[in-house]
Amino acid sequence: MSIKILKDEIKSELDKNPKYREMLFRRGYLLTDKKLNSLDEYPFYGIWSEIRVDKYFLYIQQEQTVYKNTTGNLTSVIIGHAYNPFDMKYREDDLCDDLISAYAIGKEAYFDKVSELTGLHVIMLIDNGKIIACQDACSLTGCYFGKINNRIYITEHPQLVADLCGLTIDSKVEKLVESKCYNIGNRHLPGNITPYKELKRLGANTYLLYDNSFCIKRFYPICNHPEFITENDKNKHIEEIGRLIHNGIDCCAKKWNRCTISLSGGTDSKTTLACANGLYDKFSYFSFHSKPQELVDAEGAKKICDNLGLEHTLYHIPEENSRFDDFDFIKKLLQHSTNYFVNLADNEIRKYIFLHDLSAYDIELKSWASEVARVFFERKYEIKMPKILNERCASVFQTRFFGHPGLLKWSDKQYIDFLRETGLEKPLYNYEHTDLFYWEIRMGCWGVSVISSQQLYHRMTMPMNNRKILELFLSFPHDERKSDSVHKRIMAHMNKKVIDAEVEIPNLYFHGYRIWMEKLFFKFRTMFYRSKII
């Protein structure tokens, strides 16, 4: 079925039946210089509102939140949510004021203030018609942009713009997504492309500037990060990281009523739980399993909660699609809203529908942003990564490309363009290239796709999705981060009972025949490759 036909099918059903209209492009936004006159029709259906921002029109879906403050010729906009664990401000109107004040000092001060903020958000500043847009630390909130028929579009959902403008999917993207190799990997597109040639993706640590035309500029890093060598230094900053994560969790407890922390037995999750010490009565705790492999994690989480005296809820997600009303249609809605390249598995869709229908929480605290600091690639491939990675490494990290050498070369070309455009073709200051690759490519490309699909249910946040906190993590020695020593020291400092539960869940992703094949493919495809980027 072609994308065009699927759009028509969705429109036909939603025109007749309003029940699922709120699921289409849920929590979406669209900034454009074109006034839209049909907000009662597909794809808006009367549940999007219009806000005038300088000379632009901002359209917001009913489940999304937006905050706007104007001072003189400056307008600050936060789409989504944000909070500051450094000064404990958690009302976005106050944060908009702070951003305007910082911008008045200078661009460096402005982005330093941006880097203090935790949450899932897109931040825009409009200065006499000029737009400066950036995202949360790991760019988990989508920001796609383009100029079509001399009109600008900045949005969470490329497919929304495609529907409005009649765009056609790029044949190369279609070939990649439909290939057998695509799902053997992270299910995202190479570089900063989208399914449509007219639109591109903004990513972590960069900002979008619009001043008659679009360009991407880097604002982080601007200097070396600290290097914690002495035990005194390490102890001091273990305490600081724990305090800042705790502060962010405290901000969440103040911002929302029905707060929950989703748990597994993994390192990131346990670190968040330990840092919530002193706030445990403000949260509920849950795990789920939508396939048998997830049950081990869920049972580990329950054991930790038992050791802390916390009530834990385990949700058993039904394993049959037939248990959910209109499953096939909701699957099509999700496929459309996630731009046809996320390729969600049925068990994931069942989980999302279950949580949507449950509607039990205002905010869920997740933890996986801190993976940025855990030397993922070396732990997975069990080899020392080169100091400088290239476009081929990025392609193979993304998709295994078994039997598709033509697609592999095409992917390399997209990454060459991306790395040059973002200034990531070589290490920046004393940051390890692999760390920035994971932060800006794995998290930026894959993470934003995951969050986009999870917008179907309650709102999520990540107390560790903060640029300054991640920088502190990265300031610890490589081997200590790789062994999870840093996370374990934070747990021990914040709540030793989390460690005393003795729950250690092995990462099944790092074992088995599949990973052996991936290691072999990585070595074969990178060993003799000569980079074309320099």
Q: Where on the chain are the PLM-derived regions?
A:
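ATP-dependent adenylate-handling active sites, centered on carboxylate activation for C-N bond formation
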Residues: 1, 5-21, 129-132, 140, ...
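Cysteine-centered catalytic environments shared across enzyme families
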Residues: 2-261, 271-315
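Short, intrinsically disordered low-complexity segments
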Residues: 25-26, 441, 524, 531
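Acidic, low-complexity intrinsically disordered regions
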Residues: 44, 406, 435, 442, ...
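Structural motif
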Residues: 108, 112, 171-175, 425-436, ...
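Acidic, carboxylate-rich catalytic segments that either coordinate divalent cations
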Residues: 355, 526-534
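Core structural elements
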Residues: 437-449
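Short amphipathic alpha-helical segments embedded in low-complexity Lys/Glu-rich regions
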Residues: 507-509
